[in-house]
Design a protein with these regions (language model features):
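Regulatory hinge/linker segments at domain boundaries
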Residues: 1-18
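Basic, Lys/Arg-enriched C-terminal extension of HTH/homeodomain DNA-binding domains
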Residues: 8, 13, 52-78
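The N-cap/first-turn positions of alpha helices
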Residues: 19-23
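Short helix-to-turn junction characteristic of helix-turn-helix DNA-binding domains
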Residues: 27-31, 70
């Protein structure tokens, strides 16, 4: 379980905004995009836009790749 993901690591490593880092954290925790949007209190379209931005900043193109990248980053930098 990755609920103790420190979003500051994601912000620092990938230059994510706080909102993007929170979305990435929920996705890494196993939530889907709709669940993550609901948890964050944002519209699905907002979450999709943030996800596209996260993909651009991290260089990945799929949620599964993003989760893998986040988990590897946490192992490396925690």
């Amino acid at each position: 379980k990755t609920s103790d993901i420190d979003i500051r690591i994601l912000i620092s490593l990938y230059k994510l905004t706080r909102a993007e880092a929170m979305l990435a954290k929920y996705l890494a925790d196993g939530a889907n995009l709709d669940q993550s949007a609901a948890q964050l209190g944002i519209a699905r379209n907002t979450a999709r836009a943030q996800l596209r931005s996260i993909f651009a900043k991290t260089g990945v193109s799929q949620q599964s790749m993003l989760v893998s990248l986040i988990l590897k980053s946490l192992v490396t930098f925690s």
